């Protein structure tokens, strides 16, 4: 009793302290519970992370040719932004989100969060269907945790035919944009839940066990030995997309022989390339274009359907008696001659050549997503849940580039064997089906002993650069892509340990020199004086496509380029600046090309119909606009700076480490990226500062650069619209300048392909609300950076928001002329202007001779090259 009384007395005396302690314990428990929930959620959403998972030992060097990466994310929650640095083979540099402002102006009002775009809204769970609409109507920044670009729902009242319970399927339904796609997803899921979609077991006919991988050796002397029977004839299946017609012609020129056959499928979205390929095929009886076209997305089931349909076509073309089927893309190129390839295949005319993933089947199944159900619609590959691999068979796979015998192709296309029929059903709902279907059919068929674990190619894999989840906007998975070959990779092209006859990838916009080296190695040099060997042109716009394929930024830039060029012609010294050389543009440009020389971007070539100011017929001119460099390296002379370059642009390709938006044309609604390239040296921490045209410090952040770091890049989440005009990005160390560059946010003369209206200009060209680009204010850095007083610049910026019509065009032209210069003009047809050279006689025009990419007649030896 005494002890009880003491306890009660103590409780009464310290009841306030006890209550406080209990409250603190309760609060801590809630916090721990909350964070544990977050960790569990993140564990299931690893695909959202920007940084790729650590590679297994040897994975970076093993050439498995499989492009699957790891599980992607369907995007449950928007993640915080983070910076990245890249440096292959060494620990990456860290980008630190460090607020370097010294004070915050109390008068500034923090902006509301930017609205979520239709393609990036979080529509899973309770938020489904509650799309936020932005007042300005422009998209926000991409979210690392979402399937960027995946279409979003337009009809949230869709009701499936069964109760769908899987989180992957529910997420796909919430994100699909069309009712047809939602219906397809629901039908597939309902059939799968009922157990009637996937085969439970598949018959296996192969009597062998283990991997069928007979080694085949090859040396150059075998090409000279007599063949067993007549030389084989090859059906080349070329699967192409994009706009690189000149590189495709160069490939065709290298592999062409009159004894072979060429069947070309052009992606349904590549109309310009299709027109060019159809014209190309008219000159050769053994070159045909598929009369049908499909949209073949990366990882999609459509690619396998395209191959199977093409195989049927090739089997049924009268007179095309081919022995082998070889698929190629426009980024492939031969590494040995046609004679060597024919000799090799003639000695192995009963073999099928496919590259396998290796020995660890269970790991391959997980990595490839074969145990997941996928469906393709709305040009997206949706992950819908888990599934079981059919019993009774060995699942294999690796590369979707192969060399197959005609007999095996006939078996796959025409057989009613349950093995093929049921595997077709299984692979209809499979990610990357072409990387596994033919392997699995062959390895379980009676022809399993014909499999050779070699697809006769060498692929330039660098998984630390190529596995960046770059396809998550079209597939709910993380995938990999091989790197482009460069001259330093040439030794890899000379494989001696195994027979290889093709290599990939090559891109002339990235590096053309390696193609020159390889072409010389195979066929010798072109005659002395051959033009354009170091030049490359690629079309970016053609009038036949219409302006719908152009962004407002590109439409603004191309029309401004034409005006600048015509103004240059009219104001130049005689003989250019005569009345006969004064023109007015007629309509929109008819075509635009990228121009490269010696693997350096040289600018845009704009073809424009014009009307002479003097009396005369209409003419067509081509104009060359060249970018002007604005980089300043400002490191102290007594301290060698590691900084090599500082660039700002959009469409950064982390795999090839370049901006795909050549020339850096960007507008108020774009999301620019700052990229720094470094030489090796001591660790350093640098500060990056972005300054807008009115001297507003838009953002500042620190980057830590390790000793071996080569590239750092970061896209700050700036509020938009960005203020048009010249921006400055400074790089400092201890507030001492290392480098500085300028870039242009282009004032738009078009909005939604129509001339800009005043009510649109008033917000589109005004910068972000309250001049706040970030939640933090960095204006306190103005004095440290010695920025000018902003009043005059602010007044000019305010006037610019009211401009439309010719006044707006004049402002756009002035700004553009500070970053671009007219490098040349030429006439496509006859012109009275005495100083206009015919385009065909120039070295830079897209109409000038380009022998390396011109096909011409078949030579006496049956070849084009």
Swiss-Prot record:
Q: Which cellular components does GO assign to this protein? A: extracellular space; Golgi membrane
UniProt feature, compositional bias: Low complexity: 125-137
Spell out the protein name for this chain: Xylosyltransferase 2
The UniProt entry, under PANTHER family, shows: XYLOSYLTRANSFERASE 2, XYLOSYLTRANSFERASE OXT
Indicate the principal place this protein occupies in or around the cell.
Golgi
The record lists UDP-alpha-D-xylose as bound by 239, 267, 296-298, 400-401, 481, 504-505
Q: Which UniProt keywords apply?
A: Disease variant, Disulfide bond, Glycoprotein, Glycosyltransferase, Golgi apparatus, Magnesium, Manganese, Membrane, Metal-binding, Secreted, Signal-anchor, Transferase, Transmembrane, Transmembrane helix
> Bias regions of kind Basic residues — which residues?
73-82
UniProt-annotated glycosylation sites, renumbered to this chain: 122, 327, 683
Disulphide bridges: 162-190, 206-448, 467-480, 469-478, 581-833, 826-839
Q: MF terms per GO, please? A: magnesium ion binding; manganese ion binding; protein xylosyltransferase activity
Name of the gene encoding the protein in the UniProt record? XYLT2
Location of the region described as Disordered in the Swiss-Prot/TrEMBL record: 41-157, 846-865
**TM spans (from-to):** 16-36
What disease has this protein been linked to? Answer: Spondyloocular syndrome: A syndrome characterized by cataract, loss of vision due to retinal detachment, facial dysmorphism, facial hypotonia, normal height with disproportional short trunk, osteoporosis, immobile spine with thoracic kyphosis and reduced lumbal lordosis. Pseudoxanthoma elasticum: A multisystem disorder characterized by accumulation of mineralized and fragmented elastic fibers in the skin, vascular walls, and Burch membrane in the eye.
- Organism of provenance: Homo sapiens
Q: For bias kind Basic and acidic residues, which ranges apply? A: 53-65
Q: Which residues lie on this side of the membrane: Cytoplasmic?
A: 1-15
Q: What class of enzyme is it?
A: transferase
PTM note says:
Contains disulfide bonds.
Q: What is the recorded function of this protein according to its Swiss-Prot or TrEMBL entry?
A: Catalyzes the first step in the biosynthesis of chondroitin sulfate, heparan sulfate and dermatan sulfate proteoglycans, such as DCN. Transfers D-xylose from UDP-D-xylose to specific serine residues of the core protein.
Write out the catalysed reaction: UDP-alpha-D-xylose + L-seryl-[protein] = 3-O-(beta-D-xylosyl)-L-seryl-[protein] + UDP + H(+)
A GO BP annotation: glycosaminoglycan metabolic process
Family membership, please give it. Belongs to the glycosyltransferase 14 family. XylT subfamily.
**Localisation per UniProt entry:** Golgi apparatus membrane; Secreted
- Pathway(s) annotated for this protein in UniProt: Glycan metabolism; chondroitin sulfate biosynthesis; Glycan metabolism; heparan sulfate biosynthesis
Where in the body, by tissue, does this protein show up? Widely expressed. Expressed at higher level in kidney and pancreas.
Complex formation = Monomer.
């Amino acid at each position: 009793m005494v002890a009880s009384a003491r306890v009660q007395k103590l409780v009464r005396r310290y009841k306030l302290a006890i209550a406080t302690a209990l409250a603190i314990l309760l609060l801590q428990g809630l916090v721990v519970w909350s964070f544990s929930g977050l960790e569990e959620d993140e564990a299931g959403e690893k695909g959202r992370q920007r940084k790729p998972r650590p590679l297994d030992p040897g994975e970076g060097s093993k050439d498995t040719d499989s492009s699957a990466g790891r599980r992607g994310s369907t995007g449950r929650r928007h993640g915080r932004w983070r910076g990245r640095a890249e440096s292959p083979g060494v620990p990456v540099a860290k980008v630190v989100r460090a607020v370097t402002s010294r004070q915050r102006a109390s008068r500034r009002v923090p902006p509301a969060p930017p609205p979520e775009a239709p393609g990036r809204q979080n529509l899973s769970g309770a938020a489904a269907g509650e799309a936020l609409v932005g007042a300005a109507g422009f998209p926000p920044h991409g979210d690392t945790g979402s399937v960027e670009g995946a279409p979003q729902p337009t009809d949230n009242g869709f009701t499936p035919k069964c109760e769908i319970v899987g989180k992957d399927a529910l997420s796909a339904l919430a994100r699909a944009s069309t009712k047809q796609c939602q219906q397809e997803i629901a039908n597939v899921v309902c059939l799968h839940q009922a157990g009637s979609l996937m085969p439970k077991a598949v018959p296996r006919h192969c009597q062998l066990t283990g991997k069928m991988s007979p080694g085949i050796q090859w040396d150059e002397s075998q090409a000279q030995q007599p063949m067993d029977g007549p030389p084989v004839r090859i059906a080349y299946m070329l699967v192409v997309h994009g706009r690189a017609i000149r590189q495709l012609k160069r490939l065709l020129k290298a592999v062409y022989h009159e004894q072979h056959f060429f069947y070309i499928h052009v992606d349904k979205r590549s109309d310009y390339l299709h027109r060019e390929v159809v014209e190309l095929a008219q000159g050769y009886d053994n070159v045909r274009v598929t009369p049908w076209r499909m949209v073949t997305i990366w990882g999609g089931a459509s690619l396998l359907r395209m191959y199977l349909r093409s195989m049927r076509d090739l089997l049924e073309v009268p007179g095309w008696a081919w022995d082998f089927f070889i698929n190629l893309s426009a980024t492939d190129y031969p590494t040995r001659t046609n004679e060597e390839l024919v000799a090799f295949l003639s000695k192995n005319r009963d073999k099928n050549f496919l590259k396998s993933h290796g020995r660890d089947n269970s790991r391959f199944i997980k990595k490839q997503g074969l145990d997941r159900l996928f469906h393709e619609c709305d040009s997206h590959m949706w992950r819908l849940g888990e599934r079981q691999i059919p019993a009774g068979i060995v699942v294999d796979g690796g590369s979707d580039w192969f060399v197959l015998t005609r007999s095996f192709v006939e078996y796959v296309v025409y057989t009613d064997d349950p093995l093929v029929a049921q595997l077709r059903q299984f692979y209809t709902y499979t990610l990357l089906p072409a990387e596994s279907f033919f392997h699995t059919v062959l390895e379980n068929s009676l022809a399993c002993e014909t499999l050779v674990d070699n697809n006769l190619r060498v692929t330039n894999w660098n998984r630390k650069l190529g596995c960046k989840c770059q396809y998550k906007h079209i597939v709910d998975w993380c995938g990999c892509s091989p790197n482009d070959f460069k001259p330093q990779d040439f030794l890899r092209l000379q494989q001696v340990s195994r027979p290889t006859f093709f290599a990939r990838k090559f891109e002339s916009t990235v590096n053309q020199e390696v193609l020159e080296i390889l072409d010389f190695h195979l066929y010798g040099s072109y005659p002395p004086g051959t033009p354009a060997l170091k030049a490359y042109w690629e079309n970016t716009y053609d009038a036949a496509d219409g302006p719908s394929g152009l962004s407002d930024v590109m439409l603004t830039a191309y029309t401004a380029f034409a005006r600048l060029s015509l103004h240059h012609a009219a104001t130049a010294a005689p003989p250019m600046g005569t009345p006969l050389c004064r023109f007015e543009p007629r309509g929109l440009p008819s075509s635009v090309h990228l121009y490269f020389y010696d693997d350096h971007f040289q600018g845009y070539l704009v073809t424009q119909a014009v009307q002479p100011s003097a009396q005369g017929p209409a003419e067509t001119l081509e104009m060359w606009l060249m970018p002007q460099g604005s980089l300043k390296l400002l490191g102290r002379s007594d301290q060698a700076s590691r900084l090599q370059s500082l660039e700002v642009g959009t469409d950064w390709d982390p795999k090839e480490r370049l901006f795909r938006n050549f020339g850096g044309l960007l507008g108020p609604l774009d999301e620019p990226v700052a990229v720094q390239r470094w030489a090796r040296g001591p660790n350093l921490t640098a500060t990056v500062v972005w300054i807008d045209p009115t001297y507003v410090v838009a953002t500042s952040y620190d980057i830590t650069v390790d000793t071996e770091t080569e590239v750092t890049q970061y896209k700050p989440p700036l509020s938009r619209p960005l203020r048009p005009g010249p921006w400055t990005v400074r790089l400092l160390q201890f507030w001492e300048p290392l480098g500085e560059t300028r870039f242009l946010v282009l004032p738009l003369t078009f909005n939604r392909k129509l001339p800009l209206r005043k009510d649109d200009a008033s917000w589109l060209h005004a910068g972000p609300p309250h001049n706040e680009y970030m939640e933090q204010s960095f204006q306190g850095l103005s004095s440290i950076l010695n920025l000018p007083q902003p009043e005059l610049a602010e007044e000019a910026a305010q006037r610019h928001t009211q401009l439309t019509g010719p006044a707006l065009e004049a402002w756009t032209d002035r700004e553009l002329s500070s970053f671009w210069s007219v490098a040349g003009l030429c006439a496509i047809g006859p012109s009275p202007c005495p100083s206009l050279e015919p385009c065909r006689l120039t070295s830079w025009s897209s109409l000038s001779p380009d022998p390396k990419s011109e096909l011409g007649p078949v030579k006496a030896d049956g070849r084009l090259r």
